[in-house]
Amino acid sequence: PMLKERVEILNVVGTKLVDSYEGDWLNFIKNGPRKLYSNGEGLVERLVLEFPRFNDSSIYLDKEVNFYKLAQLAFWGIHGELAHTGYFRIEDMESMTAFADYIVPVALIVMKITQYSDELEDKIMSGKMIERDSSEEIEIRSASIYATAKLTESVNRRRKDLESLIIPQLDYRLWKHYHATHFPHHLTYTTMY
């Protein structure tokens, strides 16, 4: 879906990458601290500033809500590939949130951790579109971030002598398992997730 928009995004990102970083993401990474957030200089902060495509933000009750799903996911992938090599390791991975998308909310609903209002559930079950930046969409995504953080805390309390999980690890487990289900998820026309 949205192929034309996605091609345009890739062209814009590619042009910026070539113009500013010799076409190499590693040059972008090397150009700042090895942190996601660092007083405006962190990897996610720079990515959403320099590549507006990654600036996944919404306004809710007159306040900006930053989801940064794809920005965080990009560095989660890079970290996963390079951390074990010693070449690149993000120092503040614990500051990463869940990747607010379509699937994690389904996992949380099926597990009875969260629930929708009757009206919202009817919309989702009947396949009605949830508008991008609507209160409903922002609340679904925000609730999934909050609930996943709380679930991670709960799991870690039970793992006393084991290495603690970080939120993206739990997010992946939820996503992987529930991605294959046929339980309806919310539908939003967006390239942000």
What are these regions (language model features)?
Residues 1-193:
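HhH-family (HhH-GPD) DNA N-glycosylase catalytic core used in base-excision repair
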